[in-house]
Amino acid sequence: MTDFSPREIVSELDRFIVGQHDAKRAVSIALRNRWRRLQLEGSLREEVLPKNILMIGPTGVGKTEIARRLAKLAGAPFIKVEATKFTEVGYVGRDVEQIIRDLVEVAISQVREKKRKDVEARAQIAAEERVLDALVGANSSATTRDSFRKKLRAGELNDKEIEVETQSTGGGSPMFEIPGMPGAQMGAISLGDIFGKMGGRTKTRRLTVEDSHELLVNEEADKLLDSDQLVQEAINAVENNGIVFLDEIDKICVRDGRSGGEVSREGVQRDLLPLIEGTTVSTKHGAVKTDHILFIASGAFHIAKPSDLLPELQGRLPIRVELSALTRDDMRRILTEPEASLIKQYVALLQTEGVTLEITDEAIDALADVAVAVNSSVENIGARRLQTVMERVLDEISFTAPDRDGETIQVDAAYVQKHVGDLAKNADLSRFIL
């Protein structure tokens, strides 16, 4: 769990996302409150519930990007799901409890990675012994092993092929469903899970010494880990630090005066209620309480309104944050400021072909102008419009780049106007092309 202060979290998000200060503040405070709660005494800690967030804003302004960056920052079990993927219990499809099961799997992977680092030194030694066994045999003399060990550590044997016995992951195990078990995905039991612990199937693989190293180190590290303790730690991390980002929540709103296909939409909202309020979800690793999991919901609310959500669901998302539509100045900053801005990406991509791309300040202004003009005349899709415009402008350069090795190409305002200016002016054309 990260112990960044809200100010540090906001400045970290600023490196990748332009504007939207209110949304960044809200998620940074929510994330810091997770840490604050863990510093409290036992009885009070149970009483402090997370303040769930609803982010409202047009498409392409940074809602999903905030979630993605937050996931990397959080150092906590984090999952991003689209609300539209789920159906009401009883309908064919995934029920919302699957969110928590997936979150547990994410946490187990995180904890396993962390614990592998703790036993890495011992695992390296064990993996080295297995490679030596494959190279010179288990019964070889100490002198032979030592001479091969020196060569192995010096990297002289990296390209040599060896045969190693590895644990089969059970990926091909047949699955069968147990009727009546909660959640179809949970009910699908793999025979590999049942028989995996009884001897565990192994298979022989032929690999180079270099390729086998990581595989064997991970396998030896897993042997040194206590799987029951690992699962318990993961469940504890989910219950106390877990974060669920629910995207596209506006798509499961039931709009006034509409019926028909809306039944399962409202059903999904009803199923989300206990999950957000706090319930116990059964997973194959054990029961998980959702009382202290933080839920961040987001939606564009183009057609539906936040008030179209079930009143109970609105009450369980007490913090409302509105993200503003992007201005021309924002568009210009998006092209240049973030660490992996669009312009930096295109320059780096063309550099691989030996082409140096230079985009002038006037060209950046022109790109921002075109994106804003098309957004206002056709459909406002926010910053995503910049990708479309950039692709059109650099289409010719990208196509001919392999033949222009060593060239320096300058893109100015006139070049931008030549390639997309007419399209931007003609709303009918831009409707189909931009």
From Swiss-Prot:
<feature type="binding site">
    <location>
        <position position="384"/>
    </location>
    <ligand>
        <name>ATP</name>
    </ligand>
</feature>
<feature type="binding site">
    <location>
        <begin position="60"/>
        <end position="65"/>
    </location>
    <ligand>
        <name>ATP</name>
    </ligand>
</feature>
<keyword id="KW-0143">Chaperone</keyword>
<keyword id="KW-0547">Nucleotide-binding</keyword>
<dbReference type="Pfam" id="PF10431">
    <property type="entry name" value="ClpB_D2-small"/>
</dbReference>
<dbReference type="Pfam" id="PF07724">
    <property type="entry name" value="AAA_2"/>
</dbReference>
<dbReference type="GO" id="GO:0036402">
    <property type="term" value="F:proteasome-activating activity"/>
</dbReference>
<dbReference type="GO" id="GO:0005524">
    <property type="term" value="F:ATP binding"/>
</dbReference>
<comment type="subunit">
    <text>A double ring-shaped homohexamer of HslV is capped on each side by a ring-shaped HslU homohexamer. The assembly of the HslU/HslV complex is dependent on binding of ATP.</text>
</comment>
<dbReference type="InterPro" id="IPR003959">
    <property type="entry name" value="ATPase_AAA_core"/>
</dbReference>
<dbReference type="Pfam" id="PF00004">
    <property type="entry name" value="AAA"/>
</dbReference>
<feature type="binding site">
    <location>
        <position position="18"/>
    </location>
    <ligand>
        <name>ATP</name>
    </ligand>
</feature>
<dbReference type="InterPro" id="IPR004491">
    <property type="entry name" value="HslU"/>
</dbReference>
<feature type="binding site">
    <location>
        <position position="312"/>
    </location>
    <ligand>
        <name>ATP</name>
    </ligand>
</feature>
<dbReference type="InterPro" id="IPR027417">
    <property type="entry name" value="P-loop_NTPase"/>
</dbReference>
<dbReference type="InterPro" id="IPR019489">
    <property type="entry name" value="Clp_ATPase_C"/>
</dbReference>
<keyword id="KW-0067">ATP-binding</keyword>
<dbReference type="GO" id="GO:0016887">
    <property type="term" value="F:ATP hydrolysis activity"/>
</dbReference>
<dbReference type="GO" id="GO:0008233">
    <property type="term" value="F:peptidase activity"/>
</dbReference>
<dbReference type="GO" id="GO:0009376">
    <property type="term" value="C:HslUV protease complex"/>
</dbReference>
<dbReference type="InterPro" id="IPR003593">
    <property type="entry name" value="AAA+_ATPase"/>
</dbReference>
<comment type="function">
    <text>ATPase subunit of a proteasome-like degradation complex; this subunit has chaperone activity. The binding of ATP and its subsequent hydrolysis by HslU are essential for unfolding of protein substrates subsequently hydrolyzed by HslV. HslU recognizes the N-terminal part of its protein substrates and unfolds these before they are guided to HslV for hydrolysis.</text>
</comment>
<comment type="similarity">
    <text>Belongs to the ClpX chaperone family. HslU subfamily.</text>
</comment>
<keyword id="KW-0346">Stress response</keyword>
<keyword id="KW-0963">Cytoplasm</keyword>
<dbReference type="InterPro" id="IPR050052">
    <property type="entry name" value="ATP-dep_Clp_protease_ClpX"/>
</dbReference>
<dbReference type="GO" id="GO:0043335">
    <property type="term" value="P:protein unfolding"/>
</dbReference>
<dbReference type="GO" id="GO:0051603">
    <property type="term" value="P:proteolysis involved in protein catabolic process"/>
</dbReference>
<feature type="binding site">
    <location>
        <position position="247"/>
    </location>
    <ligand>
        <name>ATP</name>
    </ligand>
</feature>
<protein>
    <recommendedName>
        <fullName>ATP-dependent protease ATPase subunit HslU</fullName>
    </recommendedName>
</protein>
